[in-house]
Amino acid sequence: MKPVLHSGSSSNGFSHRRFEKEAWMNNAQPSVDNTENGWDAESVDTPSQKLLVYFTTCNIGHQVEVHLKNGSVYSGIFHAANVEKDFGIILKMACLIRDSRGTKSRTVSKPSSKLLKIPADELVQVIAKDLPLSSDSVSDSVQCEKPLELLTDSLISQFYNVDLERELKPWVPDEDVPDCSDLENVFDDPWKRGWNQFEVNKTLFGVTSTFDEELYTTKLERGPGTRELEEQALRIAREIVGENTRDIHVAEERGLQLSGKFDIDEETKYSSVCATNRFDDTCYEDDEEEEEDILLDCCNNLTFGDSSASDGKEPASTGKFYEDSWGDSLHLRSNKMVDQSWSNSNKHTRQLMSELPSKDFPVAGNNIRNESQLGEQRKSKFLGASLFKKPSEESVSGFEDAPPPVKPSFIDGRLGLLSDRAKSENSSGWPGSSISRNSENSAASSASNLPILSPSSSGSLSSEKSTLNPNAKEFKLNPNAKSFKPSPSATRPQSPQSPVFDGSFYYPPVPPMPGLHIRYGTGAAFPGQQHPMMYNNTTQLSPNQTYYSPNSPQYPQPMMVTQQRPILFMPPTPYQPEMPYKGRDSY
């Protein structure tokens, strides 16, 4: 092996290595007409010689490994070869992979930039991996080097003539291997001898492990509530496992038995790319009704707790606990319906009471009932109408012990008293209240057909406090408040709507000033309604008035020393004096 040594640069700037390389390559090229080298043209025409030349040509520019007789291995780019009697080659960017002693070289990561010449007497073999030998492969590699070309599927299938992938087969365990269904405790089996990596490292290598489980997991605080937390965690886990799923893989992991109606392979079944989003619901062994029952049980377990206690699988204490929870839940549901009916009736009562104005309440000194009693009577009437409207809902809502309805004569008497009171006050009302009075009377007459509760029950319902705020106080109207009635004379009459005034401001002409060459033009007076007016309280010199456009910029008027400033005058409108303030207690 004689490597080519680096030589200094020549005087013309080119290195001697280039000329030596070109001279050696010229001597290495065979010539058919040259017979001085000891071989003739017939030796090149042999099939083995042609095949060797073809393989050598295919290796040019590819990464190869060259094995020598002394055991050394070089790796580099195949650059040139001498196909004459001896088969010497030249490697470019060659590096030593393995020396003659069989040890790997440390200079593998630092490839040499030299041209390495290997004579034929030291060469054993040349190994080239992934070398294209067919013309199709060469054309494919050349076409794939074009990054700007758009490659379609059909074009790619024509380029790469590769073998088809082998068909996947399902894994079948050997018969002598035991079945380990539980992989969590696989090392606890007796045939595994309880293998522990920390003990093995300590026994074999003397290494003491510093592994702390609390650094990677959540530390469980043992206490009186630990058992309840574990039961709750197991219940949530059972709910998750018992949920319905549309994924075949998840269903199999949860232990759901699937029938053999799936005509798909194992790859499609467990692949994440070609996942099956839907499958037939009849794949389960249970029918559709049992599946719905399981789904309802999951919802009930999530809301009221585990339902396994009702089946007798849990201890007696647990069953009693769930039985109490079911009873409490039913009680809460009944109370919720009662509160809902009470809130709806109370809402209806407030809505109808808000329609009646404050004039329905009597004035102080009247022998009719006060305002609070009247409000309670109205509330009891509407509550009775809402409670006794649907008798079928009484047993569900918990009103089995409600008192019987009051006689119609008693109802008609009370509502007649209210209607008479409303009519008497409507006669003394002011003119603008006739429409609202008619609507209120119609509402009162329509409410006269509704039954009410007894006075005792209505009083108990009206005296209840809100369940939202225990410290809330009951709101009652002030019975000593005086009703406010505005007098017709104090009200301001509504004047007809005046048309929108679009006029301009008119000013009297400015008197002539001595020495002023600029004169203001005057025009005729603008007819129509003229207010507001701006004028000077001085003697006008001309009947004409100067016109100022409202959209034009206004400039100050030139004034004489003795001239007074213009005054803006607004004509007063006839109005009556306002109502005097009588104080806070008068309302």
From Swiss-Prot:
| PROSITE patterns tied to this protein | SM
Q: Which UniProt keywords apply?
A: Repeat
What cellular component GO annotations does this protein have?
Answer: cytoplasm
Q: Which InterPro entries match?
A: ATXN2-like, LsmAD_domain, PAM2_motif, Sm, SM_dom_ATX
- One Gene Ontology term of the molecular function aspect: RNA binding
Region named Disordered? 422-503
| Annotated motif PAM2-like 2, positions | 476-486
| Residue stretches of biased makeup (Low complexity) | 431-464
Cross-referenced Pfam families, in alphabetical order?
LsmAD, PAM2, SM-ATX
- Per the record's keyword annotation, is Repeat included, yes or no? yes
Q: Where is the composition biased (Polar residues)?
A: 486-498
Which segment of this protein is annotated as the motif PAM2-like 1? 467-475
Q: Which residues form the Sm domain?
A: 51-132
Keyword Repeat tagged: yes
Q: What is known of its domains?
A: Contains a tandem repeat of a PAM2-like motif, which seems to be involved in the binding to the PABC/CTC domain of PAB proteins.
Record-given protein name: Polyadenylate-binding protein-interacting protein 3
The primary gene name is CID3
